[in-house]
């Protein structure tokens, strides 16, 4: 057990690490140490979910309780993937991404519980275990110890391939609603062929959920402004931010293209999500995502947005995914309080491989919107290790000279990472930017390359088969 003790001493919570491993046979290698840590963490997640099941009366909100139960299920799913990694020949970066997601799930649940005054020792315990396991895997990743190269292949639509089902409101397709088509696909394993749902032109007033067991689903429409999915759930109408989304993608390998997703609750109803994605290795291509506060919830996983339009006001690109927005147009609308914040990234552990990268895009006011008197910022830190980088992007006059704004969190100003690299436009000047320790005007090209697709979301292993165009360099 001496070897395990030494490894535990290098984790953020050594005492809990040693307690976790104390009943295990002697640890003889770093690989075995990681495997034991992940397995014990998985056991803890199963127990925490069971404990939370019996906490329903304390929640006082069935919606919040169901949200936590769902997040525990997703956490168990990600930890299972990590446990099976050696058998499936995946990479350390895969494991780090899945552990980052598990920790994000727990944080989302914790936030709901804190608002309701509910406490859970098992939630606190499993959070510490995931934090420790993240640190262990990060150390091994830095030392170059790999399980192998990912062999998961995402089979996808290319020109001329057959669409599986068609959705049409007039009855000319296989289904009249999108959710019926998703349900008709059934459970689909990772690595299964892409299941393609074509949604014909129309306004679909429904809430769509592509669940965690629905992997490799593609939903393709007839174009932005033609195939429209719309809803109006919001915080102001009694829904949590997490549950307010018009469209939810949870199954891995999701692809959405040529569709519009809207939340029409309006700025007076506060948080109102149009799209929430928890889908690892997900892609959105030529989509319009429209709302006001909290429009695009990049909750967790590795995500890529290409040639998308995103509309909003306050924190309208937010969450803790590893998300890259490339060749996108980001439109600020009129906010209710005179302040727009484009991003609110919520990385809260330095070992999480998460952040928001805006690359080769355009940030400007929405068409027809007058932003006189409105202050617009590139972002604010939702959590202490928030990470947002803007690269090669056109920033219009709406961006305030100081660029970024605080969230009443003085500590975060030194631990966050906000970066700008070779942007253009009247709002791109950095001479009057914030003087925080965590803000960087990036001058080193090697530092900037850390936020390219291959480095930041491990794109080489999964993005090319989607047939979506992308740029791998700066």
UniProtKB/Swiss-Prot annotation:
This is Putative pectinesterase/pectinesterase inhibitor 38. GO terms for molecular function: enzyme inhibitor activity; pectinesterase activity. NCBIfam families: PME_inhib (TIGR01614). The keyword Hydrolase applies. The record marks 293 as: Transition state stabilizer. The gene is PME38. Pathway: Glycan metabolism; pectin degradation; 2-dehydro-3-deoxy-D-gluconate from pectin: step 1/5. In the N-terminal section; belongs to the PMEI family. In the C-terminal section; belongs to the pectinesterase family. Disulfide bonds join 308-328. Signal peptide: none annotated. Pfam families: Pectinesterase, PMEI. Keywords: Aspartyl esterase, Cell wall, Cell wall biogenesis/degradation, Disulfide bond, Glycoprotein, Hydrolase, Secreted. Its EC number is 3.1.1.11. It is an enzyme of class 3 (hydrolase). GO terms for biological process: cell wall modification; pectin catabolic process. Substrate binds at residues 241, 271, 380, 382. Residues 164-461 are annotated as: Pectinesterase 38. The keyword Cell wall biogenesis/degradation applies. The active site is at residues 294, 315. The PMEI region may act as an autoinhibitory domain and prevent untimely PME activity during transport. InterPro entries: Invertase/methylesterase_inhib, Pectin_lyas_fold, Pectin_lyase_fold/virulence, Pectinesterase_Asp_AS, Pectinesterase_cat, Pectinesterase_inhib_dom. It comes from Arabidopsis thaliana (Mouse-ear cress). It catalyses: [(1->4)-alpha-D-galacturonosyl methyl ester](n) + n H2O = [(1->4)-alpha-D-galacturonosyl](n) + n methanol + n H(+).
